[in-house]
């Protein structure tokens, strides 16, 4: 640690997280040097609250930086649903870009509390109705029954999750999740589909999306790359990962899709 601090004198705090730690505290992280870590960061002029000890990760995903930029550039005046929101950074970026309404959905209200802090940092107006701490499956069903629809839906689920309400499985059940949210998207709206499963190849993922596009009501609009400074591999397109991400440049595979509705004659 001493050598690290000499080489990188700007370091104020070091946290060690043990993936296979025997306690939850070890997995979420223990401060081994310095004071309390920073609780906010800024990206593209927007503030994001963070809590480095909240979970096993850093509470903020750098790999979706290009997607936050896309949200800021494309969602002005739009109504947005951020499913599996975690700490809500995609929704925060949408609001920073001028979205008129963002619904942040995650079954863990503790994660959504970080999103609320981000709203405060940016002086965004907030309402209890902007945050929905419910399981994805019943929450989406309720939105359908009450006639809610959106210009853009972010679908960024965990690799695997199972509750008594339903199963999320990015390796075998991603199409089901997409079909679950499609009815909520307005004509010419966007469905942003993210699959970060390292065991799902880029070609397999893309093929599954192309199969969903066969009816003509869904189309692939854009593939967003992960920032090069995040890829973490000497040659991210070489197939050295568990599954080759090509044509994506990382196992975090981001696709912007356009949605069409059947128009009443």
What do these predicted ranges mean?
Residues 135-214:
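S-adenosylmethionine
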Residues 101-106:
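Conserved SAM-binding motif I beta-strand of class I
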């Amino acid at each position: 640690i001493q050598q690290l601090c000499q080489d990188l004198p700007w370091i104020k705090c070091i946290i060690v997280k043990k993936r296979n730690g025997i306690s939850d505290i070890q997995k979420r992280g223990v401060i081994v040097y310095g004071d309390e870590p920073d609780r906010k960061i800024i990206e593209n002029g927007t503030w994001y609250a963070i809590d480095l000890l909240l979970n096993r990760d850093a509470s903020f995903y750098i790999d979706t930086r290009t997607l936050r930029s896309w949200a800021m550039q494309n969602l002005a005046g739009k109504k947005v649903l951020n499913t599996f929101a975690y700490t809500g950074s995609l929704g925060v970026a949408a609001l920073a870009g001028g979205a008129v309404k963002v619904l942040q959905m995650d079954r863990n209200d503790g994660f959504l509390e970080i999103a609320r802090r981000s709203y405060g940092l940016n002086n965004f107006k907030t309402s209890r109705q902007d945050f929905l701490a419910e399981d994805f499956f019943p929450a989406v069903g309720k939105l359908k029954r009450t006639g809610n629809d959106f210009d853009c839906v972010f679908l960024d689920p965990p690799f695997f999750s199972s509750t008594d309400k339903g199963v999320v499985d990015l390796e075998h059940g991603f199409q089901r999740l997409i079909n679950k949210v499609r009815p909520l998207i307005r004509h010419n709206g966007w469905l942003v589909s993210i699959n970060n499963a390292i065991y799902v190849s880029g070609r397999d993922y893309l093929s599954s999306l192309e199969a969903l596009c066969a009816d003509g009501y869904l189309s692939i609009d854009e593939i967003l790359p992960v920032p090069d400074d995040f890829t973490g591999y000497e040659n991210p397109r070489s197939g050295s990962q568990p599954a080759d991400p090509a044509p994506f440049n990382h196992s975090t595979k981001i696709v912007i899709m356009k949605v069409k509705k059947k128009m009443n004659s």
